[in-house]
Amino acid sequence: MTRQGNRARADIGIIGGSGLYDVEGLQKVKELSVKTPFGVPSDTVLLGELDGIRIAFLSRHGRGHRVNPSEINYRANIYALKSLGVRRVISVSAVGSMKESIKPGDVVLPDQFIDLTKRRVSTFFEGGIVAHVAFGDPVCASLGAALLDAAHTVGATVHRGGVYICIEGPQFSTKGESRLYRQWGASVIGMTNLPEAKLAREAELCYATVALATDYDCWHETEQAVTVDSILTTLRQNVVLAKRLLRTAMPAVTDVKSCNCQRALQDAIITAPDRMPASLRRKLALLIDRVVPVKKGIQ
């Protein structure tokens, strides 16, 4: 294992959810221990090449699945990827289906989120620097299109768009909750994509989710209610498909043009530069230097 160095760079970050703890075909792998101003990420970062493309892989729950959704240090995870030069993040997540048409084993590429989390810090900007980023379209359309093409190429049953509802967990929903979420128009349900997507936007990273449907939550009248065992059974098949999808998508993801995601902070920071606490300004330098240049003489 090595510590992060100046040469440790990647353009694409992959955050692996339940069942996805590595990237198939990754070569020249280095295991990096990345320190951030926001603490330690969920695990070490695997940096390597996938068909010549530099990839940074981070296991969201840690290898061996040690960290529950409420305990994940989302800020450290996103900051760590940003510090390695990542500009585009692909999230791979196990989800429950909230629609009859989305069957276990299907792939969903959500384009909207509903945040029902309760215990999580959802911003980098607090304690003296305030920012309000636009989040009406939380998923990078260009990145999503590249993933859609790859899903078709590998023969996945894929659903374009949809609403991912993120609950706190770690318990699964009650039937009453599950039925309510269906009335709201939810497509899938999970526990991890928020605040992850919000923080990616604040870090000016393109973000998109590959959601792997494993079950029907607990709303379905004729299907078994969700259990860990049922999730793992379907997940083993889904992960094989997800690895093929990711590898197929890489060339197109690399070619994704610069978009508004990478300019999210342009007019978002409202705090006057001369009122920013110096220590906080230094802490957020990686995120805000592009839009709030450091004045000469300020350390």
Where do the PLM segments sit?
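Zn-dependent metallopeptidase/amidohydrolase metal-coordination segment
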Residues: M191-D229
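Metabolite-binding pocket within alpha/beta catalytic cores that recognizes anionic/polar moieties
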Residues: T2-G136, V291-K295
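A short, charged, Gly/Pro-tolerant segment at domain boundaries
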Residues: S258-V294
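Histidine/lysine/aspartate-rich catalytic loop segments that bind and position anionic ligands
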Residues: G127-A131, F135-Q171, A203
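Non-catalytic positions within long, well-ordered alpha-helices that form the structural scaffold/packing
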Residues: K82-G85, R182, R201
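Active-site/ligand-binding-proximal alpha/beta "capping" segment
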Residues: T153-S187, I270, D274
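His/Asp/Glu-rich mid-to-C-terminal helical/loop segments that flank catalytic regions of hydrolases
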Residues: C218-L265
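A cross-taxon signal for low-complexity, glycine/charged-rich
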Residues: G297-Q299
